[in-house]
Amino acid sequence: MQLQVARIGKPHGIRGEVTVQVLTDAPSERFVAGTEFVVEPASAGPLTIRSARWNKDILLLGFEEIADRNAAEVIRGAKLFIETEELSDEDDDEGWYEHELVGLEARVGSQVVGKVAALSTLPVQDLLTVTTEEGKEILIPFVDEIVPEVNVEGGYILITPPSGLFEINDENAKEPKDGAGDDA
Protein backbone atom coordinates (compact mmCIF):
# COMPACT_ATOMS: atom_id res chain seq x y z
CA MET A 1 0.00 0.00 0.00
CA GLN A 2 1.16 3.53 -0.71
CA LEU A 3 1.09 6.50 1.63
CA GLN A 4 0.87 10.07 0.33
CA VAL A 5 3.56 12.23 1.94
CA ALA A 6 3.38 15.42 -0.15
CA ARG A 7 1.76 17.38 -2.95
CA ILE A 8 3.91 19.37 -5.36
CA GLY A 9 3.21 23.09 -5.58
CA LYS A 10 4.53 25.83 -7.82
CA PRO A 11 8.05 26.03 -9.25
CA HIS A 12 10.67 27.99 -7.32
CA GLY A 13 13.54 29.55 -9.23
CA ILE A 14 14.95 28.44 -12.58
CA ARG A 15 16.74 25.22 -11.58
CA GLY A 16 13.65 23.02 -11.28
CA GLU A 17 12.95 23.28 -7.56
CA VAL A 18 9.33 23.10 -6.44
CA THR A 19 7.42 24.05 -3.32
CA VAL A 20 5.85 21.13 -1.50
CA GLN A 21 2.79 20.77 0.72
CA VAL A 22 4.09 18.37 3.38
CA LEU A 23 1.61 15.67 4.46
CA THR A 24 3.84 13.77 6.86
CA ASP A 25 4.89 14.35 10.44
CA ALA A 26 8.53 13.46 9.73
CA PRO A 27 9.69 15.60 6.79
CA SER A 28 13.35 15.50 7.81
CA GLU A 29 13.27 11.69 7.52
CA ARG A 30 11.11 11.42 4.39
CA PHE A 31 12.66 14.12 2.20
CA VAL A 32 16.36 13.29 1.91
CA ALA A 33 18.58 13.12 -1.17
CA GLY A 34 18.21 9.82 -2.99
CA THR A 35 14.67 9.08 -1.82
CA GLU A 36 12.48 7.87 -4.69
CA PHE A 37 8.75 8.55 -4.76
CA VAL A 38 5.90 6.97 -6.64
CA VAL A 39 4.03 9.82 -8.33
CA GLU A 40 0.41 10.34 -9.24
CA PRO A 41 -0.17 10.88 -12.11
CA ALA A 42 2.24 8.12 -13.08
CA SER A 43 3.32 10.07 -16.17
CA ALA A 44 5.13 12.52 -13.85
CA GLY A 45 7.35 9.99 -12.12
CA PRO A 46 8.93 8.26 -10.40
CA LEU A 47 10.90 11.14 -8.90
CA THR A 48 14.17 11.00 -6.95
CA ILE A 49 15.14 13.80 -4.56
CA ARG A 50 18.27 15.69 -5.55
CA SER A 51 17.99 18.39 -2.87
CA ALA A 52 15.73 19.41 0.00
CA ARG A 53 15.79 22.70 1.89
CA TRP A 54 13.50 24.93 3.89
CA ASN A 55 12.77 28.53 2.92
CA LYS A 56 10.54 30.45 5.37
CA ASP A 57 8.65 27.33 6.55
CA ILE A 58 8.20 26.10 2.97
CA LEU A 59 9.91 22.91 1.86
CA LEU A 60 11.67 23.19 -1.50
CA LEU A 61 12.59 20.00 -3.32
CA GLY A 62 14.80 19.46 -6.34
CA PHE A 63 14.46 16.21 -8.29
CA GLU A 64 17.08 14.47 -10.41
CA GLU A 65 14.52 14.11 -13.22
CA ILE A 66 13.55 17.82 -13.24
CA ALA A 67 16.19 20.13 -14.74
CA ASP A 68 14.44 23.49 -15.10
CA ARG A 69 11.41 25.62 -14.28
CA ASN A 70 9.46 24.43 -17.35
CA ALA A 71 9.80 20.78 -16.32
CA ALA A 72 8.85 21.74 -12.74
CA GLU A 73 5.66 23.40 -13.99
CA VAL A 74 4.60 20.12 -15.65
CA ILE A 75 4.62 18.23 -12.32
CA ARG A 76 2.70 20.92 -10.43
CA GLY A 77 -0.12 19.34 -8.42
CA ALA A 78 1.38 15.83 -8.54
CA LYS A 79 1.13 13.69 -5.40
CA LEU A 80 4.19 11.99 -3.89
CA PHE A 81 3.82 8.55 -2.30
CA ILE A 82 6.05 6.11 -0.44
CA GLU A 83 5.49 2.39 -0.08
CA THR A 84 4.15 1.61 3.41
CA GLU A 85 6.45 -1.43 3.64
CA GLU A 86 9.21 1.19 4.00
CA LEU A 87 7.64 2.53 7.19
CA SER A 88 9.23 1.52 10.46
CA ASP A 89 7.22 0.13 13.37
CA GLU A 90 7.84 3.42 15.18
CA ASP A 91 5.61 5.18 12.63
CA ASP A 92 2.65 2.98 13.58
CA ASP A 93 2.79 3.48 17.37
CA GLU A 94 0.19 6.23 17.41
CA GLY A 95 -1.83 8.23 14.96
CA TRP A 96 -3.51 7.43 11.69
CA TYR A 97 -2.80 8.07 8.06
CA GLU A 98 -5.27 9.91 5.86
CA HIS A 99 -6.04 6.82 3.78
CA GLU A 100 -7.13 5.01 6.98
CA LEU A 101 -9.55 7.78 8.00
CA VAL A 102 -11.13 8.85 4.71
CA GLY A 103 -14.51 7.17 4.27
CA LEU A 104 -15.11 6.44 7.96
CA GLU A 105 -18.51 7.40 9.36
CA ALA A 106 -18.43 10.40 11.69
CA ARG A 107 -20.76 9.83 14.65
CA VAL A 108 -21.99 11.91 17.55
CA GLY A 109 -23.20 9.25 19.97
CA SER A 110 -25.17 6.83 17.79
CA GLN A 111 -26.12 9.49 15.21
CA VAL A 112 -24.17 9.49 11.93
CA VAL A 113 -23.39 13.11 10.99
CA GLY A 114 -21.29 12.47 7.89
CA LYS A 115 -18.16 10.82 6.50
CA VAL A 116 -14.51 11.74 6.88
CA ALA A 117 -13.40 13.32 3.59
CA ALA A 118 -9.86 14.47 4.43
CA LEU A 119 -7.19 14.93 7.06
CA SER A 120 -5.24 18.20 7.08
CA THR A 121 -1.96 18.12 8.98
CA LEU A 122 -1.26 21.60 10.28
CA PRO A 123 1.49 22.98 12.53
CA VAL A 124 -0.76 23.53 15.56
CA GLN A 125 -3.20 20.61 15.24
CA ASP A 126 -4.68 18.33 12.64
CA LEU A 127 -8.16 18.91 11.20
CA LEU A 128 -10.63 16.36 9.90
CA THR A 129 -12.95 17.42 7.10
CA VAL A 130 -16.31 15.71 7.52
CA THR A 131 -18.82 15.87 4.67
CA THR A 132 -22.46 15.74 5.80
CA GLU A 133 -25.25 13.97 3.93
CA GLU A 134 -26.26 17.41 2.62
CA GLY A 135 -22.79 17.81 1.11
CA LYS A 136 -21.58 20.47 3.54
CA GLU A 137 -18.05 20.34 4.94
CA ILE A 138 -17.41 20.54 8.68
CA LEU A 139 -13.90 21.06 10.02
CA ILE A 140 -13.27 19.07 13.20
CA PRO A 141 -10.14 19.59 15.33
CA PHE A 142 -8.52 16.14 15.46
CA VAL A 143 -7.73 16.14 19.19
CA ASP A 144 -8.57 13.53 21.84
CA GLU A 145 -11.09 15.79 23.59
CA ILE A 146 -13.22 16.16 20.43
CA VAL A 147 -12.45 12.86 18.66
CA PRO A 148 -12.03 10.43 21.57
CA GLU A 149 -12.44 7.28 19.49
CA VAL A 150 -11.21 6.18 16.08
CA ASN A 151 -12.32 2.68 15.12
CA VAL A 152 -10.86 1.89 11.71
CA GLU A 153 -12.01 -1.74 11.85
CA GLY A 154 -15.54 -0.66 12.85
CA GLY A 155 -15.59 2.01 10.15
CA TYR A 156 -16.27 5.07 12.30
CA ILE A 157 -14.94 7.91 14.41
CA LEU A 158 -16.75 9.22 17.48
CA ILE A 159 -17.03 12.98 17.86
CA THR A 160 -17.88 14.82 21.09
CA PRO A 161 -18.27 18.34 19.71
CA PRO A 162 -18.27 21.39 21.96
CA SER A 163 -21.35 23.59 21.69
CA GLY A 164 -21.32 25.63 18.52
CA LEU A 165 -18.83 23.52 16.54
CA PHE A 166 -21.37 22.73 13.84
CA GLU A 167 -22.66 26.32 13.73
CA ILE A 168 -19.15 27.73 13.37
CA ASN A 169 -18.76 25.69 10.20
CA ASP A 170 -22.22 26.43 8.81
CA GLU A 171 -24.91 28.87 9.93
CA ASN A 172 -27.67 26.48 8.77
CA ALA A 173 -26.29 23.33 10.42
CA LYS A 174 -28.13 21.76 13.33
CA GLU A 175 -26.41 20.37 16.40
CA PRO A 176 -26.85 16.60 16.69
CA LYS A 177 -29.65 15.73 19.12
CA ASP A 178 -27.58 13.25 21.13
CA GLY A 179 -26.73 15.83 23.78
CA ALA A 180 -23.02 15.49 23.19
CA GLY A 181 -21.17 18.71 23.60
CA ASP A 182 -23.46 20.11 26.30
CA ASP A 183 -21.44 21.96 28.88
CA ALA A 184 -23.89 21.31 31.75
From Swiss-Prot:
The gene is rimM. Belongs to the RimM family. Keywords: Chaperone, Cytoplasm, Ribosome biogenesis, rRNA processing. The PRC barrel domain binds ribosomal protein uS19. An accessory protein needed during the final step in the assembly of 30S ribosomal subunit, possibly for assembly of the head region. Essential for efficient processing of 16S rRNA. May be needed both before and after RbfA during the maturation of 16S rRNA. It has affinity for free ribosomal 30S subunits but not for 70S ribosomes. It is found in: Cytoplasm. GO terms for biological process: ribosomal small subunit biogenesis; rRNA processing. Binds ribosomal protein uS19. HAMAP family: Ribosome_mat_RimM. Residues 93-165 form the PRC barrel domain. GO terms for cellular component: cytoplasm; ribosome. This is Ribosome maturation factor RimM. The keyword Iron-sulfur does not apply. GO terms for molecular function: ribosome binding.
